[in-house]
Structures are given as C-alpha cells and as structure tokens.
Amino acid sequence: MATGTTTKMPMRRHTLFAVSACIGVAAFGAALIWRAPLAYSIGANVFFAAYLVLVIAHMPRLTGSYLRKNAGDTDLPVLAIFAVTLVVVAIAIISLFQLINREKSADAVELTVALLSIPLGWLTIHAMAALHYAHLYWLDGDAMDGDTKKRIPVGGLDFPGGKRPEGSDFLYFSTVIGMTAQTADTNVTTSQMRRVVLVHSILSFFFNTVIVAAAVNLAVSLGSL
C-alpha cells in the first residue's frame, strides 16, 4: 500500500479556460432567459471571475517541478484562447461605452456590472499571459550550466534569486508588464520570449488607454447628470 500524502495536481492550463468559458456561457444564457440588461457584460464578467478564481486557486500547485514536467501540455491552441478572450473583453468594453453614451441614464446596478468588466478583463488577460509565460519558459526543459554544472531552465526569463520560478513568479512578471509595459527586475534573455513580451506590452498599452478613455467618458457622463 502506498504511503505518504498525495498532492492534488492542478488542471491543465487550458482546462481552466474551458471550464471558465462554460460557466460564462451558462451565465450569459441565464441572463438572456431572465431578460436581464447587459447580458453580454454579465456573461463576460462571470467568465473573467471564474477564470481568475481558478488561476488563483491553482497558483500554489504550479511549482517549478510541475511546470518543468508538464510544459508541453497544449490541449487547445494558445492563439485561439487569446483571440476568444480579447473578443469577450471587446464586447464588455463596447457594452460599457454604449451604456455610458445612451440617452437614458443608467442605474447603479447597470453601471457596476459594466464597469466591472474592465478590471476583471484586465486581470484575466494578464493571468492568462502569466500561464503562457510559465509554460513557454519550461517548454524546452533544462540545460546544463557550464560553470556551475547544475541543470537550469532555458526558457528566456532571468528571475533574481536563483530559485526555480513558480506560478506566482510568472504572475508577478505578467502583471508588471501589464501595468508598465516594461520589465522590472526580471531580464528577458531569448528572442522568442522577447516577441511574446512585445506583443503583451503593446496589448497592455492599448488596454490601459481604453481604461483611461472609459474613465474620462464616465466622468463626463456622470457630470452631465
């Protein structure tokens, strides 16, 4: 009989997306059945919230050892996932602008639902990018360091501290890119990773611009009431 404690393994990274998407679609369908206003925003917000909860719950299990062994898991195309998520974010943002600029004043509940889509969408994109960074980092496995004779990852990010990076390290890196569109204390060391960081930085810049525009638009709208 096996002894010792067994560690519950996390879902595959794309399973998180699939489960969250199903929950979001169910919420959207329920909103349509109940004829709730802003059904698109409700579905988007539930998808975002479900994904974030699942990612946060799985972070402690995304150890360096697990990521190294499972980096090759690609049960859904990454580009397709990002494309679907960006479409959902766009729908949520468009719903917000339509709500702000319509002739009839929005009530507090409608504004809250619409406004939540922006921070939740922002966090979802960067959480998704964090998992992509993590798996891309460990995709090529380990290499032997010629000086120390130790096995080191060849993933393209140089985290300070000398320890194997875990899920929270990649979430930190992704959030820094999302907030500042630049790196902080982590160096990018390969061309492949630089391309990913470049796309992420450009996306973050435009998303942050949309957030500022939405805030200004909302302030003007509320000031005219």
Regions found by a protein language model. Give the residues of each.
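Pore domain of cation channels
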Residues: 169-176, 184-224
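Membrane-proximal soluble regions of multi-pass membrane proteins
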Residues: 137, 143-187
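The first (N-terminal) embedded transmembrane alpha-helix
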Residues: 9-32
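Alpha-helical transmembrane segments and their membrane-interface junctions
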Residues: 88-111, 175-191
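Helix-coil boundary and interhelical linker segments in multi-pass alpha-helical membrane proteins
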Residues: 28-39, 98-113, 221-225
